[in-house]
Regions:
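Structured catalytic-domain cores with a bias toward divalent-metal coordination
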Residues: 1-263
Length: 263
Protein backbone atom coordinates (compact mmCIF):
# COMPACT_ATOMS: atom_id res chain seq x y z
CA UNK A 1 0.00 0.00 0.00
CA UNK A 2 1.40 3.39 -0.95
CA UNK A 3 1.66 6.23 1.55
CA UNK A 4 -1.11 8.16 -0.19
CA UNK A 5 -3.37 5.11 -0.18
CA UNK A 6 -2.78 4.58 3.53
CA UNK A 7 -3.55 8.23 4.33
CA UNK A 8 -6.78 7.99 2.34
CA UNK A 9 -7.76 4.78 4.14
CA UNK A 10 -6.91 6.24 7.56
CA UNK A 11 -8.95 9.38 6.94
CA UNK A 12 -11.94 7.31 5.88
CA UNK A 13 -11.77 5.05 8.95
CA UNK A 14 -10.57 7.45 11.66
CA UNK A 15 -12.78 7.80 14.73
CA UNK A 16 -12.60 11.20 16.44
CA UNK A 17 -11.95 11.02 20.17
CA UNK A 18 -12.26 13.58 22.92
CA UNK A 19 -10.28 13.85 26.14
CA UNK A 20 -12.52 15.40 28.81
CA UNK A 21 -10.85 16.94 31.81
CA UNK A 22 -13.18 15.17 34.26
CA UNK A 23 -14.57 11.66 34.64
CA UNK A 24 -18.21 12.59 35.18
CA UNK A 25 -19.16 10.71 32.02
CA UNK A 26 -17.52 8.15 29.78
CA UNK A 27 -19.92 8.57 26.88
CA UNK A 28 -17.02 9.56 24.63
CA UNK A 29 -15.72 5.98 24.87
CA UNK A 30 -18.99 4.22 24.08
CA UNK A 31 -17.85 3.73 20.49
CA UNK A 32 -15.58 0.96 21.80
CA UNK A 33 -18.43 -1.23 23.05
CA UNK A 34 -19.27 -2.96 19.79
CA UNK A 35 -15.63 -3.53 18.96
CA UNK A 36 -14.62 -4.85 22.40
CA UNK A 37 -17.24 -7.60 22.41
CA UNK A 38 -15.78 -10.40 24.59
CA UNK A 39 -12.13 -9.37 24.28
CA UNK A 40 -10.29 -9.75 27.58
CA UNK A 41 -6.92 -8.21 26.67
CA UNK A 42 -6.55 -4.78 25.05
CA UNK A 43 -3.17 -3.53 23.81
CA UNK A 44 -2.82 0.23 23.39
CA UNK A 45 -0.06 1.41 21.06
CA UNK A 46 2.38 3.96 22.45
CA UNK A 47 2.60 7.41 20.89
CA UNK A 48 4.83 9.16 23.46
CA UNK A 49 5.71 9.09 27.14
CA UNK A 50 5.54 12.83 27.50
CA UNK A 51 2.09 14.00 26.35
CA UNK A 52 -0.71 14.96 28.72
CA UNK A 53 -3.34 13.92 26.18
CA UNK A 54 -1.92 10.45 25.67
CA UNK A 55 -1.58 9.69 29.37
CA UNK A 56 -4.98 11.18 30.18
CA UNK A 57 -6.73 9.20 27.45
CA UNK A 58 -5.09 5.94 28.49
CA UNK A 59 -6.05 6.47 32.14
CA UNK A 60 -9.66 7.19 31.16
CA UNK A 61 -9.69 4.16 28.90
CA UNK A 62 -8.69 1.82 31.72
CA UNK A 63 -11.27 3.34 34.06
CA UNK A 64 -13.94 2.84 31.42
CA UNK A 65 -12.87 -0.75 30.81
CA UNK A 66 -12.98 -1.50 34.54
CA UNK A 67 -16.33 0.19 35.09
CA UNK A 68 -18.17 -1.11 32.03
CA UNK A 69 -16.35 -4.19 30.76
CA UNK A 70 -14.91 -5.87 33.85
CA UNK A 71 -11.24 -5.35 33.05
CA UNK A 72 -9.11 -5.89 36.14
CA UNK A 73 -5.44 -5.32 35.29
CA UNK A 74 -3.38 -2.35 34.12
CA UNK A 75 0.11 -3.10 32.77
CA UNK A 76 2.63 -0.29 32.34
CA UNK A 77 6.06 -0.14 30.71
CA UNK A 78 8.01 0.52 33.89
CA UNK A 79 10.50 -1.43 35.98
CA UNK A 80 9.13 -4.68 37.37
CA UNK A 81 11.57 -4.81 40.26
CA UNK A 82 10.78 -1.28 41.45
CA UNK A 83 7.15 -1.51 40.38
CA UNK A 84 6.20 -4.13 42.92
CA UNK A 85 5.82 -1.25 45.36
CA UNK A 86 3.14 0.18 43.08
CA UNK A 87 1.41 -3.19 42.73
CA UNK A 88 1.28 -3.55 46.51
CA UNK A 89 0.16 0.06 46.99
CA UNK A 90 -2.78 -0.45 44.64
CA UNK A 91 -3.63 -3.58 46.62
CA UNK A 92 -3.71 -1.54 49.85
CA UNK A 93 -0.16 -1.49 51.23
CA UNK A 94 0.65 1.53 53.41
CA UNK A 95 3.55 3.13 51.51
CA UNK A 96 4.51 6.79 51.31
CA UNK A 97 3.43 8.34 48.03
CA UNK A 98 6.89 9.72 47.25
CA UNK A 99 8.23 6.16 47.24
CA UNK A 100 5.46 5.10 44.88
CA UNK A 101 6.14 7.91 42.42
CA UNK A 102 9.86 7.11 42.40
CA UNK A 103 9.12 3.45 41.76
CA UNK A 104 7.35 4.23 38.47
CA UNK A 105 10.37 4.66 36.23
CA UNK A 106 10.77 5.21 32.47
CA UNK A 107 9.62 8.77 33.27
CA UNK A 108 6.01 7.65 33.88
CA UNK A 109 6.08 8.46 37.58
CA UNK A 110 6.31 12.22 37.09
CA UNK A 111 3.02 12.48 35.18
CA UNK A 112 -0.10 13.52 37.08
CA UNK A 113 -2.32 11.40 34.83
CA UNK A 114 -0.55 8.16 35.79
CA UNK A 115 -0.41 9.15 39.46
CA UNK A 116 -4.12 9.89 39.50
CA UNK A 117 -4.93 6.53 37.89
CA UNK A 118 -2.90 4.63 40.49
CA UNK A 119 -4.68 6.44 43.32
CA UNK A 120 -8.03 5.74 41.64
CA UNK A 121 -7.21 2.02 41.49
CA UNK A 122 -6.22 2.01 45.17
CA UNK A 123 -9.44 3.80 46.13
CA UNK A 124 -11.46 1.29 44.09
CA UNK A 125 -9.83 -1.61 45.96
CA UNK A 126 -10.55 0.04 49.32
CA UNK A 127 -14.31 -0.01 48.68
CA UNK A 128 -16.08 -2.84 50.53
CA UNK A 129 -18.62 -3.09 47.69
CA UNK A 130 -16.10 -3.31 44.84
CA UNK A 131 -17.17 -5.91 42.26
CA UNK A 132 -13.59 -7.20 41.85
CA UNK A 133 -10.02 -6.21 42.66
CA UNK A 134 -7.91 -4.06 40.34
CA UNK A 135 -4.25 -4.86 39.86
CA UNK A 136 -1.23 -2.95 38.58
CA UNK A 137 1.67 -4.77 36.96
CA UNK A 138 4.95 -3.37 35.59
CA UNK A 139 6.37 -5.08 32.49
CA UNK A 140 9.92 -3.72 32.07
CA UNK A 141 13.17 -4.73 33.77
CA UNK A 142 14.87 -2.51 36.32
CA UNK A 143 16.75 0.80 36.54
CA UNK A 144 16.19 1.56 32.85
CA UNK A 145 18.63 -1.29 32.13
CA UNK A 146 21.60 0.73 33.37
CA UNK A 147 22.52 -1.54 36.32
CA UNK A 148 21.30 -4.65 38.14
CA UNK A 149 21.63 -3.45 41.73
CA UNK A 150 17.93 -3.29 42.58
CA UNK A 151 17.26 -6.69 41.04
CA UNK A 152 20.07 -8.17 43.10
CA UNK A 153 18.70 -6.59 46.28
CA UNK A 154 15.20 -7.94 45.62
CA UNK A 155 16.37 -11.48 44.92
CA UNK A 156 18.85 -11.50 47.80
CA UNK A 157 16.16 -10.35 50.24
CA UNK A 158 13.90 -13.19 49.08
CA UNK A 159 16.72 -15.73 49.31
CA UNK A 160 17.55 -14.60 52.84
CA UNK A 161 13.96 -15.47 53.84
CA UNK A 162 13.58 -18.81 52.10
CA UNK A 163 17.12 -20.21 51.70
CA UNK A 164 19.99 -18.54 53.59
CA UNK A 165 22.49 -20.75 51.75
CA UNK A 166 21.38 -19.26 48.43
CA UNK A 167 21.68 -15.76 49.89
CA UNK A 168 25.25 -16.52 51.00
CA UNK A 169 26.12 -17.87 47.55
CA UNK A 170 24.71 -14.75 45.93
CA UNK A 171 26.90 -12.59 48.15
CA UNK A 172 29.98 -14.58 47.18
CA UNK A 173 29.21 -14.86 43.48
CA UNK A 174 27.43 -11.64 42.59
CA UNK A 175 27.52 -8.83 45.15
CA UNK A 176 30.84 -7.32 44.13
CA UNK A 177 30.31 -7.80 40.42
CA UNK A 178 26.85 -6.29 40.38
CA UNK A 179 28.31 -3.22 42.06
CA UNK A 180 30.99 -3.00 39.35
CA UNK A 181 28.77 -3.37 36.28
CA UNK A 182 26.82 -0.45 34.87
CA UNK A 183 25.94 0.76 31.41
CA UNK A 184 28.22 3.77 31.82
CA UNK A 185 31.24 1.66 32.84
CA UNK A 186 30.52 -1.39 30.68
CA UNK A 187 33.84 -1.30 28.80
CA UNK A 188 35.85 -1.47 32.03
CA UNK A 189 34.61 -5.00 32.79
CA UNK A 190 36.38 -7.93 31.12
CA UNK A 191 34.58 -10.53 29.02
CA UNK A 192 35.65 -13.21 31.48
CA UNK A 193 34.12 -11.26 34.37
CA UNK A 194 30.86 -10.83 32.45
CA UNK A 195 30.78 -14.57 31.74
CA UNK A 196 31.29 -15.37 35.42
CA UNK A 197 28.53 -12.99 36.53
CA UNK A 198 26.03 -14.08 33.89
CA UNK A 199 26.73 -17.72 34.72
CA UNK A 200 26.23 -17.06 38.43
CA UNK A 201 22.98 -15.19 37.82
CA UNK A 202 21.76 -18.02 35.58
CA UNK A 203 22.53 -20.52 38.33
CA UNK A 204 20.50 -18.42 40.79
CA UNK A 205 17.55 -18.51 38.38
CA UNK A 206 17.91 -22.28 38.05
CA UNK A 207 18.02 -22.84 41.81
CA UNK A 208 14.91 -20.73 42.35
CA UNK A 209 13.08 -22.66 39.63
CA UNK A 210 14.12 -26.04 41.06
CA UNK A 211 13.05 -25.11 44.59
CA UNK A 212 9.65 -23.72 43.61
CA UNK A 213 7.62 -25.84 46.03
CA UNK A 214 9.90 -25.26 49.02
CA UNK A 215 10.35 -21.55 48.36
CA UNK A 216 6.64 -21.01 47.84
CA UNK A 217 5.86 -22.82 51.08
CA UNK A 218 8.35 -20.58 52.90
CA UNK A 219 6.89 -17.38 51.40
CA UNK A 220 3.86 -17.15 49.10
CA UNK A 221 2.94 -17.75 45.48
CA UNK A 222 3.19 -14.03 44.78
CA UNK A 223 6.55 -13.62 46.51
CA UNK A 224 7.95 -16.56 44.58
CA UNK A 225 6.73 -15.30 41.20
CA UNK A 226 8.01 -11.76 41.74
CA UNK A 227 11.37 -13.02 42.95
CA UNK A 228 11.86 -15.48 40.11
CA UNK A 229 11.12 -12.72 37.62
CA UNK A 230 13.55 -10.40 39.43
CA UNK A 231 16.24 -13.08 39.17
CA UNK A 232 15.62 -13.44 35.45
CA UNK A 233 15.88 -9.66 35.09
CA UNK A 234 19.13 -9.66 37.09
CA UNK A 235 20.58 -12.13 34.59
CA UNK A 236 19.17 -10.32 31.56
CA UNK A 237 20.44 -6.88 32.60
CA UNK A 238 23.94 -8.29 32.99
CA UNK A 239 23.65 -9.91 29.55
CA UNK A 240 22.32 -6.72 27.98
CA UNK A 241 25.13 -4.55 29.35
CA UNK A 242 27.75 -7.16 28.39
CA UNK A 243 26.54 -7.08 24.77
CA UNK A 244 26.37 -3.29 24.45
CA UNK A 245 29.25 -2.07 22.32
CA UNK A 246 31.43 0.88 23.29
CA UNK A 247 30.06 2.85 20.32
CA UNK A 248 26.68 3.62 21.83
CA UNK A 249 25.07 4.47 18.50
CA UNK A 250 25.52 0.79 17.72
CA UNK A 251 25.24 -0.44 21.30
CA UNK A 252 21.90 1.18 22.05
CA UNK A 253 20.21 -1.05 19.48
CA UNK A 254 21.81 -4.12 21.03
CA UNK A 255 20.71 -3.04 24.51
CA UNK A 256 17.09 -2.46 23.51
CA UNK A 257 16.92 -5.70 21.53
CA UNK A 258 17.89 -7.72 24.61
CA UNK A 259 15.56 -5.62 26.74
CA UNK A 260 12.60 -6.14 24.40
CA UNK A 261 13.14 -9.90 24.28
CA UNK A 262 13.35 -10.01 28.08
CA UNK A 263 10.04 -8.16 28.45
Amino acid sequence: MSQDAFVAWARAHAIPISIPGTDESYDDLRFLDAWLDEKRILLVGESAHYLHEWNRWRARLFKYLALHHGYTTFVLECGLVEGRLVHDYVAGADTQWNEIARAINNVWGVWAEINELIRWMREWNARPDRPFELRFYPMDGTANWTHAGRAYEAVHAFAARVDPALAEDMEAWLAGGVAEVSLADRTEVSDARYCDLIGAASLVVSRIEQARLAYTAASSYDDYDWSLRAAQILRDVLMAIAQTEADFEVGVRQLWNVRDVSM
